[in-house]
Curated annotation (Swiss-Prot):
Family: Belongs to the HAK/KUP transporter (TC 2.A.72) family.
Protein name: Probable potassium transport system protein Kup
Task performed by this protein: Transport of potassium into the cell. Likely operates as a K(+):H(+) symporter.
UniProt organism field: Burkholderia ambifaria (strain ATCC BAA-244 / DSM 16087 / CCUG 44356 / LMG 19182 / AMMD)
HAMAP family hit by this protein: Kup
Domain of life, per lineage: Bacteria
Catalytic activity: K(+)(in) + H(+)(in) = K(+)(out) + H(+)(out)
Keyword Nucleotide-binding: no
Transmembrane feature ranges: 24-44, 64-84, 113-133, 151-171, 182-202, 225-245, 261-281, 290-310, 351-371, 381-401, 409-429, 433-453
Keywords attached to this entry: Cell inner membrane, Cell membrane, Ion transport, Membrane, Potassium, Potassium transport, Symport, Transmembrane, Transmembrane helix, Transport
Length: 637
């Protein structure tokens, strides 16, 4: 009897696990695969762009389709799904998480560590270059279906694109949790539809299946040489969004993403690209828009609507990714503090960063108006994607050798293959710098300069503060030996270093000559892991006389919460805290550029400007503004 019950329980648990896995896989399809899933809208069309000079013969069509097929198999199916996704930082993926993981076994003062950090930051910056192009090219290419369905409405493509994008960014502040539940099912329908369209045309021209043979890809490269290499820059468009598989791993887990990729996404993409190839063999004039011309005439308008919805979902995933990446960068100290709002009480990862939102919209609208069509924008797209792919491969190599201790020869062989592919794609896209590739490169370079300036500037400020600082615990012992006047209430001193006396305390003692009965020195520390367990978050030292030194540790995917820290500290010390009865003392630092060693004076001025415009601690830590006492201090750098 017991064996029967245990078997039933085990079967129920297995069934529940399978159901949960399927639910996560469907949710992942709605978030992770939007970008790569909408690539069929423009990838093959761009590969046969008239500028490339590739004739629309059967052999060249087979060659390009073969290149697309093997790019998906090697880069998505093998590199990302099998290798890169193994390199998780406590379950979290993405270029910054991978960078933090690769730096863990290294001495941070070495040149290698510095180079890897710079690589990781540059990869993050290139993501923003991608984030401004994805919504523009995706939505525009979907709306351009109107030119095929109803040619007399072609003049409305640009205005409709602009309205959709403004609406998309406008709703961000309200959160997308409600409509987000529909993303997965809608994208499942999208992948089934594009697969069905592909199968219909493959059945009419079954010879297209021969493109599975890599001989056709190699033959195409050999026959067309430089032209074929230029085409590689368009082939990479089938891989846009591949990095999202890794970056969103923390939200869904590796298994559901692999299940969705191998079970639905990759087969659907391959079938659709082969279907487009079959259509072109049958009717070369269909190169005008091979994706939409897959559909029968009666299905054109519904396909335009479905495509537009799918591209909005793809854009939403990129926008959410930009918020998450910004939040990570703030916690890791690469970006100034910004106001981060949580839009869902249930989903901790759903955040909204107003500054990022409106900057993205402004740049995207400028791009749409400036480039005017998805064809013009396609040249700008690949370079950000391929640069991030190269950086991910290099960082993954370090993790394989230094963290996993894999055999160096084995790692060398694996990485040589992946780097050859990545660098081939990156080199092909460098040829398109003048046609639009300058855009993501320029955005990435500007952001890289700003992030490195901020990181270096904060490092200099910490050095100056530490050089002039007073050790905290000996100071407190001396203070208690000759105490100033004690006043009732609680004072919280927020400080960046739990070993040094906060400047705000020195100013308070100097000007007000009082010390609160209960005084807490609170320091927030960001670890190189995404999340910190609640039972290990807080550490505290009782300095006596009602003085406490508290350190709160957070992961780079978490937002520091002063209220939660005080509640947890209160529970462990049998105290109660009321935010409205607590005074928070902060040092308001004014950075003064000087000719002291550190950075060039103009970079110091840029840093000072960034420092001045960073979000106030009251906004960032959600502290009631009327409970804060800010005491000014100047720091020369």
């Amino acid at each position: 009897m017991n064996d029967t019950i245990q078997a039933t329980d085990a079967a129920h648990a297995h069934s529940t696990h399978q159901h949960s896995m399927r639910a996560l896989a469907i949710a992942a399809i709605g978030v992770v695969f939007g970008d790569i899933g909408t690539s069929p809208l423009y990838a093959l069309k761009e590969a046969f762009s008239p500028a490339h000079g590739i004739p629309l013969t059967e052999s060249s069509i087979l060659g390009v389709i073969s290149l697309l097929f093997w790019a998906i198999i090697l880069v998505v199916g093998i590199k990302y799904l099998l290798f890169v996704m193994r390199a998780d930082n406590n379950g979290e993926g993405g270029v910054l998480a991978l960078m933090a993981l690769s730096l863990r076994p290294l001495d941070p003062k070495t040149r290698v560590a510095g180079a890897l950090m710079a690589l990781g930051i540059f990869g993050a910056c290139m993501f923003y270059g991608d984030a401004v192009i994805t919504p523009a090219i995706s939505v525009m290419s979907a709306v351009e279906g109107l030119e095929i369905a109803t040619p007399h409405l072609s003049h409305l493509v640009l205005p409709i694109t602009i309205v959709i994008l403004i609406a998309l960014f406008w709703i961000q502040r309200h959160g997308t949790a409600l409509v987000g539940k529909l993303f997965g099912p809608i994208m499942v329908v999208w992948f089934i539809v594009i697969a069905a369209l592909g199968v219909y045309h493959i059945a009419r021209v079954p010879g297209i299946i021969a493109a599975i043979n890599p001989y056709y890809a190699a033959s195409f490269m050999a026959d067309h040489l430089l032209q074929a290499y230029v085409v590689l820059g368009s082939v990479v468009l089938v891989l846009t969004g591949a990095e999202a598989l890794y970056a969103d791993m923390g939200h869904f887990g590796a298994k559901p993403i692999r299940l969705a990729a191998y079970g639905l996404v990759m087969p659907s993409l391959v079938l659709n690209y082969f279907g487009q190839g079959a259509l072109l063999i049958q009717n070369p004039k269909a190169i005008e828009n091979p994706f939409f011309l897959l559909a029968p005439e009666w299905g054109l308008l519904p396909l335009v609507v479905l495509s537009t919805v799918a591209t909005v979902i793809a854009s939403q995933a990129v926008i959410s990714g930009a918020y998450s990446l910004t939040s990570q960068a703030i916690q890791l100290g690469y970006v100034p503090r910004m106001k981060v709002l949580h839009t869902s009480e249930l989903a901790i990862g759903q955040i909204y960063v107003p500054v990022v939102n409106w900057l993205l919209l402004f740049v995207i609208l400028c791009i749409v108006i400036g480039f005017k069509s998805s064809d013009n924008l396609a040249a700008a797209y690949g370079i950000a994607v391929t640069a991030t792919m190269v950086i991910t491969t290099v960082l993954a190599c370090v993790v394989m050798v230094k963290v996993w201790n894999w055999n160096r020869l084995l790692v060398g062989a694996i990485i040589a293959v992946f780097l050859a592919i990545d660098l081939g794609f990156f080199g092909a896209n460098l040829l398109k710098v003048a046609q639009g590739g300058w855009l993501p490169l320029g955005i990435g370079a500007l952001l890289f300069f700003l992030l490195m300036t901020w990181y270096k500037g904060r490092h200099i400020v910490k050095e100056r503060t530490a050089a002039d600082g007073i050790p905290l615990e000996p100071f407190l012992q001396g203070l208690l030996a000759h105490p100033p006047h004690r006043v009732s209430g609680t004072a919280i001193y927020l400080t960046g270093n739990d070993k040094l006396v906060p400047v705000s305390l020195l100013h308070n003692l100097k000007h007000n000559k009082v010390l609160h009965e209960r005084t807490i020195f609170l320091t927030f520390v960001t670890r190189d892991i995404p999340y910190v367990r609640d039972d290990t978050r807080l550490s505290s030292r009782d300095a006596g006389g009602g003085l406490y030194i508290v350190k709160a540790q957070y992961g780079f995917n978490e937002t520091p919460d002063v209220k939660a820290v005080l509640e947890e500290f209160g529970r462990s010390h049998d105290m109660t805290f009321e935010l409205m009865d607590t005074s928070f003392f902060l040092a308001r630092e004014t950075v003064v550029p000087t000719h002291l060693p550190g950075m060039s004076i103009w970079r110091e001025r840029v840093f000072a400007w960034m420092h001045q415009n960073a979000a106030k601690p009251t906004d960032f830590f959600s502290i009631p503004a009327n409970r804060v006492v800010e005491l000014g201090t100047k720091i020369e750098i």
